[in-house]
Amino acid sequence: MALAGLPLSVFAIAVHFCLVFSSSSSPPVCPANGHRDRTAYHFQPAKNWQNDPNGPVYYNGMYHLFYQYNPHGALWDVGNLSWGHSVSGDLVNWAALDNALDPTAPFDANGCASGSVTILPDGVPVVMYSGIDARRRQVQNVAFPKNPRDPLLREWTKPGYNPVIPVPADVSPDNFRDPTTAWLGSDGLWRFAISAVADGVGATLVYRSADFLRWERNAAPLHASRDAVMAECPDLFPVAEHGEDGLDLDASAIGGAGAGVRHVLKVSMPDTLEDYYMVGRYDDADDTFTVPPEDLEAHGDDYRRWRRIDHGHLYASKTFYDAGKKRRVLWAWVNESDSEADDVTKGWSGLQSFPRAVWLDEGGRQLVQWPVEEIETLRRKRGVLLGGNEVEAGGLREIGGIAGSQADVEVAFEIASLAGADRLEPDHLRDPDALCGENGAAVHGGIGPFGLLVMASGDLRERTAVFFRVFRLSHGYTVLMCTDLTRSTSRAGVYKPSHGGFVDIDIEKDRAISLRTLIDHSIVESFGGGGRTCMTARVYPEHVATGSSHLYVFNNASDAVKVSKLEAWELATASVNAGDDGLISYGGPVCAAQVQ
């Protein structure tokens, strides 16, 4: 649906979404534009490069996603970075609007970099973003909607008094960016956090303001590392100590150490391309973030030792509060793993992860992430496990009846005994990626590997494995979750690592573990242990050019495992930033269903 020239009301957008998905017929097995790697229900623009999610916000009954976008090509080009903009009524189907921000003024002449959206007390949203100015310094700017009554927020203006925050004298001019969503403290002052390298040390700084225009930096950083690597794309948000409801960034939740509220500080590390977080308490009296002593001792000040948002291919995550459903929702950039030449041929690069609801688990130290419930509106045909629910040692059971390239699968495994668990030495706990690489899906073990084979060819020469292993420690047991990409494609020039992470569950008590996997052509998102350990992967199998993908449950353990639950659904194709003819611009090879 083209938005230009139409009566752009919330009603019109909603009617369009309803008309597109009123049919209950099964979807095609190809993504919307026919390119074999293009996704069917993950967010991506019609063409070109995208990266960080910026300023996701729920405003006047609509979801807005702004994102880093190069409107001129499929590769990263900082000088052309703009803010792309799309709107949705359900976080699944999206309509593209014109760019919200383009590099036009001296204070952002070389790019409109990352930032956030804040809703002011009068209901007007304001963008704060990092501009790269004419001298290539990173400065902080604001922008306002041209018409605040427009529910789609189609046009934005950048005041001439920008930048509102120039580069401080002690801060590196090319390491001062990514302002967070702002919050009002209990003293009535606005605050936001921002990444910087100050006096040669990577730090998360806090600024305060009474009017959102004149800002003063807090004397002490919110948090600082011990080296010069900047922790970028910070996010600070409150979480309830109990329950799954999200909390807004208001004074009652973000300020002080209020009862029933904890806080999460998340950063993205450019040297590892991973997102890390810690659960602690933020106090707006002195703008400090503290963590429990036991966590500080275990993880220290090095961000790379903190917990990971995702143990796979995911970066620059950003959350927002969804007031409509009282939840906190996380977005993140998922980059390509093929070559730049492939991206140029396709005409696009980069996805957003499927939006995830986020809350604090009952232990109070880690986040739980789960796909937002709206994904269920795409469910069509239901799959069945062929051959029974007990999978013998070395067994393989196909999940039949659905298209394996566009699915939502949730499976639970029961383990009768832990007696056969392999021994794991303590030093192997430090590097789960390496442990998964050494113990791939084809390496038989005591309890595990067992899990799913996804995007698999009929002859199994190409397959992506998502699986678990249970290990015995000197003080109990631990569960390792892996995504093995080493056989995901026969194509040359593709990054095919093994991702790994430990799942914080009591396997000795539960004797069961769950896995949910979203499969969408070239992306596989997996959630282990009810969402306590998450892994995102990019896959580019060659077999989809001439045939269909298969989906299996496998078990390479020494004993049988029981599948106590299986819910597998084929998913319809969402309407994501489609053009006038309902299609997406693309290049390169098409998938099998459109070749025939």
From Swiss-Prot:
Q: Where is the signal peptide?
A: 1-25
Q: Please tell me where this protein is predominantly located.
A: secreted
Residues annotated as catalytic = 52
Name of this protein: Beta-fructofuranosidase, insoluble isoenzyme 6
Looking at the UniProt entry, the stretches that span the membrane are: none
Q: Which Pfam families match?
A: Glyco_hydro_32C (PF08244), Glyco_hydro_32N (PF00251)
GO cellular component term, pick one:
apoplast
Residues annotated as binding substrate:
49-52, 68, 76, 113-114, 177-178, 232
- Keyword field: Apoplast, Cell wall, Disulfide bond, Glycoprotein, Glycosidase, Hydrolase, Secreted, Signal
